[in-house]
């Protein structure tokens, strides 16, 4: 019974203290939450009545338990005390108003924010030593660069850029060793000089490639007539050359020199004869083209007729004999007859030996 009385006294003292604290908190919050306290008070009165009834019932139960369990150990008393404490705490929570809860929640949020700020400050303080390490590393790196001479070059380049007003390209880094291959840019500086007016140059003139004579390889035939007219004096030179060779042949008595002069005369005459034949061919073709064009204009033909090689050769011979005199024509015909006869004899088969007898 003595233990139960002591426990009851302690519980009552605690309840009185808690009621005093609740009254003090209610007085503080009465000015701020007047409207909300009316509903809270009605709820709190009901909760207080319930708590009082629960307390009375708990006291009766405690008395009965004390009478029945007076001889229990101290461990049982402690368990009872903890249960009573829980019930008291629950009753206290029931008596707290909503305004007090809202105010407490706001105060807890502010405390949390202050705690986060304190944590961030501590984190920055933790980072400070790492920043000092970075500073030390940066100083070491700068010292190494100064040893290599990079910092001086960069400073000079920066000064030049600031003075000139534009940024120049940084110099390439030095080689790792003297045996390393040298790096050379493939870019070549373009000269700033520009030729606005080209100077007049003396060009050599070659008549073989003169545009007045030959414009292109495809237009050689068209320009032959103009070339012949331009170099017609060469025909006179050739004729005079043949005449001089013949005079020398008549005057010389040396056999070897005569043979050389005869060969020179025959080569010159053959060359002249070939040029004359080409000239006749061109004349025949020009005459034929004119006739065909005239017939087409008159409407007698729709398409031109192109001569064959055999027909062209026949027409050239015809024109050649027409241009000759009677004596020259007879001589030429005789030479031609002999030439054809010799060819026919070569083509004939060999005669048999028995046929001769």
Curated annotation (Swiss-Prot):
Residues 238-348 form a coiled coil. Residues 1-229, 269-300, 320-357 are annotated as: Disordered. Residues 115-147, 270-300, 320-333, 341-357 have a biased composition (Basic and acidic residues). GO terms for biological process: maturation of SSU-rRNA from tricistronic rRNA transcript (SSU-rRNA, 5.8S rRNA, LSU-rRNA). It comes from the Eukaryota. Residues 168-178 have a biased composition (Basic residues). Residues 17-37, 45-75 have a biased composition (Acidic residues). Pfam families: RRP36. It is found in: Nucleus, Nucleolus. GO terms for cellular component: 90S preribosome; nucleolus. Its main location: nucleus. Residues 152-164, 213-226 have a biased composition (Low complexity). Keywords: Coiled coil, Nucleus, Ribonucleoprotein, Ribosome biogenesis, rRNA processing. PANTHER family: RIBOSOMAL RNA PROCESSING PROTEIN 36 HOMOLOG. Belongs to the RRP36 family. Associates with 90S and pre-40S pre-ribosomal particles. Component of the 90S pre-ribosome involved in the maturation of rRNAs. Required for early cleavages of the pre-RNAs in the 40S ribosomal subunit maturation pathway. This is rRNA biogenesis protein rrp36. It comes from Talaromyces marneffei (strain ATCC 18224 / CBS 334.59 / QM 7333). The lineage of its organism: Eukaryota, Fungi, Dikarya, Ascomycota, Pezizomycotina. The gene is rrp36.
């Amino acid at each position: 019974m003595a233990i139960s009385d002591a426990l009851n006294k302690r519980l009552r003292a605690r309840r009185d203290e808690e009621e005093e604290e609740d009254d003090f908190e209610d007085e503080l919050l009465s000015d701020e939450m007047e409207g909300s306290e009316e509903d809270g008070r009605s709820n709190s009165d009901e909760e207080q009545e319930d708590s009082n009834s629960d307390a009375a019932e708990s006291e009766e139960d405690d008395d009965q338990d004390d009478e029945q369990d007076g001889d229990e150990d101290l461990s049982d008393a402690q368990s009872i005390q903890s249960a009573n404490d829980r019930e008291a705490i629950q009753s206290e929570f029931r008596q707290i108003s909503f305004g007090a809860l809202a105010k407490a929640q706001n105060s807890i949020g502010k405390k949390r924010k202050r705690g986060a700020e304190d944590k961030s400050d501590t984190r920055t303080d933790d980072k400070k030593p790492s920043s000092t390490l970075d500073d030390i590393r940066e100083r070491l790196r700068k010292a190494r660069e100064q040893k290599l001479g990079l910092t001086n070059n960069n400073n000079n380049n920066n000064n030049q850029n600031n003075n000139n007003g534009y940024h120049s390209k940084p110099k390439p880094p030095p080689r790792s060793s003297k045996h390393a291959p040298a790096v050379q840019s493939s870019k070549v500086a373009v000269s700033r000089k520009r030729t606005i007016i080209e100077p007049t140059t003396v060009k050599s003139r070659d008549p073989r490639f003169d545009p007045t004579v030959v414009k292109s390889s495809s237009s050689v035939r068209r320009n032959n007539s103009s070339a012949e007219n331009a170099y017609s004096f060469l025909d006179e030179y050739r004729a005079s050359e043949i005449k001089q060779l013949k005079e020398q042949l008549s005057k010389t008595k040396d056999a070897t020199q005569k043979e050389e002069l005869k060969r020179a005369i025959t080569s010159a005459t053959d060359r002249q004869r070939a040029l004359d034949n080409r000239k006749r061919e061109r004349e025949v073709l020009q005459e034929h083209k004119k006739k065909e064009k005239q017939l087409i204009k008159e409407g007698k033909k729709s398409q031109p007729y192109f001569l064959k090689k055999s027909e062209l050769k026949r027409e050239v011979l015809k024109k050649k004999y027409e241009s000759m005199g009677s004596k020259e024509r007879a001589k030429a015909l005789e030479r031609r007859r002999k030439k054809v006869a010799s060819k026919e004899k070569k083509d004939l088969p060999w005669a048999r030996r028995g046929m001769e007898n």
